[in-house]
């Protein structure tokens, strides 16, 4: 049962609990604490309620349901599964069909996050069948939505093992994603008929994300546009921010970079309004990469510099390293080779501290090429900036890599290359992670794409700088070389 449904049951059954008033009072306090966000304390009260005991099976079922929900939110999925199974057993014992449907749905959601997709699908299908038999359209809508989520999650997990762009997954992954689309579409149609705008928006968001993974970017844009419109209509700023970000991602893959930039700018403004520093940094990173695709390297450099500053404030060393890598590339494209060399060395240092062998190799390659361009020995060290955020920072061992680093939230990874023709730019597009309406942050697939992009592009970076280093004689230092601040 949901928390609200459990509360109704607990209150209604108060008179039928002979000698069980203490159980009921403890359970209601546990529910209050869970609603207030203190699930750990709520669990303690629910456990005490069970110790107090009750002969009323509906009250006990409600306690099991809420314990399952509380453990789910605490991340203890094994215990959540245990209590949802107990709730399901009691519902069947009482021949409570609606309770059985809700317990099946809760169990399905728990099994989904545990990666037990086949079992989750069976539970969610039971939820759907019972809801339809009862004619409960709201419960049917939840079941359809949950089934879509299970197939979507299964497809994403299967897709992690490969290194494929959206639209180029193996057939088993596509099959899962297409099943997700089918259930989301049924849910969307039902929610529209019920006039539930919030649920309609969620369905559109998930349909947009799934179509994105299937490579149907035009369709993804249609759904995310509707998601954006509904979010604005109901005043859901967080959903509006997600929709803009997802629209930017989809426009990137269609080569519509100006449109992408506008959506990322809106994402940035909303992130600032919401006080979400990590997403604000993500948006700066996305804008830097988008302006690289537009070959507006000065603007790209400005956004990457903002990303670097944000990464340092967040103590996100992974994000800081990526920002240095991007800044080095942007400055190289602008011909600011000394600044590019400084950031390449910063990238190498951070990669070394993180144990990122691929990052070290990329940085070392760039350092070598830039030293050749500048006529410097490879082991020369450029002067460090002294008057900005590039000054000494907290030692690495005092920092923690954030669980949701900007790169794990990231959008695209591009190597600037001013020598390329416009027709080649689309080949630079890399994996863009579509944000889930559920708030999940699947990151491994994106990082693999970035690593593959970096590895395959090393030779291209070398070729560009080698061209600049051919028989024109030794390059002179720029007029700004006396200024040590990049």
Language-model regions: role of each:
Residues 17-18, 55, 95, 135, ...:
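Structural signature of alpha-solenoid helical repeat scaffolds
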Residues 22-54, 69-76, 156, 168-173:
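Alpha-helical segment of the N-proximal tetratricopeptide repeat
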């Amino acid at each position: 049962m949901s928390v609200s449904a459990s509360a109704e049951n607990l209150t209604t059954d108060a008179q039928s609990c002979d000698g069980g008033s203490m159980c009921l009072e403890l359970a209601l306090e546990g529910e209050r604490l869970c609603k207030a966000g203190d699930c750990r304390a709520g669990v303690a009260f629910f456990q005490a309620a069970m110790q107090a005991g009750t002969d009323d099976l509906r009250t006990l079922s409600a306690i099991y349901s809420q314990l399952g929900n509380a453990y789910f939110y605490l991340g203890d999925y094994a215990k959540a599964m245990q209590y949802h199974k107990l709730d399901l057993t009691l519902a069947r014992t009482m021949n409570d069909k609606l309770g059985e449907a809700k317990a099946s749905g809760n169990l399905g959601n728990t099994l989904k996050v545990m990666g037990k997709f086949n079992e989750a699908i069976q539970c969610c299908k039971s939820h759907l069948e019972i809801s339809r038999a009862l004619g409960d359209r709201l419960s049917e809508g939840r079941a359809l939505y949950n089934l879509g989520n299970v197939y979507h999650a299964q497809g994403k997990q299967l897709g992690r093992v490969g290194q494929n762009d959206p639209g180029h997954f193996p057939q088993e992954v596509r099959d899962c994603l297409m099943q997700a689309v089918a259930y989301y579409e049924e849910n969307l149609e039902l929610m529209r008929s019920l006039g539930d705008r919030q649920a309609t928006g969620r369905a559109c968001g998930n349909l947009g994300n799934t179509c994105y993974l299937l490579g149907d970017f035009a369709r993804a844009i249609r759904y995310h546009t509707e998601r954006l419109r509904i979010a604005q209509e109901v005043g859901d700023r967080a959903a509006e921010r997600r929709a803009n970000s997802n629209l930017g991602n989809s426009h990137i893959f269609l080569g519509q970079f100006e449109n992408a930039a506008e959506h990322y700018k809106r994402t940035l403004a909303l992130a600032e309004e919401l006080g979400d520093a990590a997403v604000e940094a993500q948006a700066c990173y996305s804008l830097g990469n988008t302006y690289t695709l537009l070959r507006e390297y000065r603007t790209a450099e400005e956004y990457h510099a903002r990303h670097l500053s944000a990464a340092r404030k967040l103590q996100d060393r992974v994000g800081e390293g990526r920002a240095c890598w991007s800044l080095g590339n942007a400055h190289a494209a602008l011909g600011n080779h000394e600044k590019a060399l400084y950031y390449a060395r910063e990238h190498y240092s951070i990669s070394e501290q993180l144990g990122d062998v691929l990052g070290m190799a990329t940085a070392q390659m760039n350092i070598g090429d830039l030293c050749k361009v500048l006529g410097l020995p490879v082991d020369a060290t450029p002067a460090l900036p002294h008057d900005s955020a590039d000054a000494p920072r907290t030692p690495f061992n005092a920092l923690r890599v954030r669980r949701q680093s900007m790169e794990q939230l990231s959008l695209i990874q591009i190597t600037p290359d001013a020598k390329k023709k416009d027709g080649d730019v689309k080949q630079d597009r890399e994996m863009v992670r579509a944000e889930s309406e559920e708030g999940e942050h699947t990151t491994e697939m994106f990082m693999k794409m970035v690593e593959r992009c970096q590895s395959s592009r090393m030779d291209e970076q070398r070729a560009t700088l080698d061209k600049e280093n051919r028989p024109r004689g030794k390059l002179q230092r720029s007029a700004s070389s006396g200024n040590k601040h990049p």
